[in-house]
Amino acid sequence: MRDDDILIGTLKEDSWLTLEQVAAACAVEPAWLVRHLEEGLIPHAESVAGVWRFSGAALIHAQRMRELERDFDAVPELAALMADLLEELDALRARVRNLDG
């Protein structure tokens, strides 16, 4: 997969993705995800019987981190912080839309 390929879709909230699926969606090696997981930089992921499972929110977070690291040469900790801030911004925008409803 090339960096400029665009994948569009919707993930059900009760669906879980594997490490390999998230790595493919982020165009990274699984080792990239493991390093970030070990450092606690990707929330909404859990290990069940030694197998990592990722929610849709974890996928979005990982994709944002990957983009920030690639596009801005950000260190992983900064990329994680920015991904957190972008998630907060998305949540606030959704609340404003609901208020304007």
What are these regions (language model features)?
Residues 2-20, 24, 30, 34, ...:
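Arg/Lys-rich, alpha-helical DNA-contact motif
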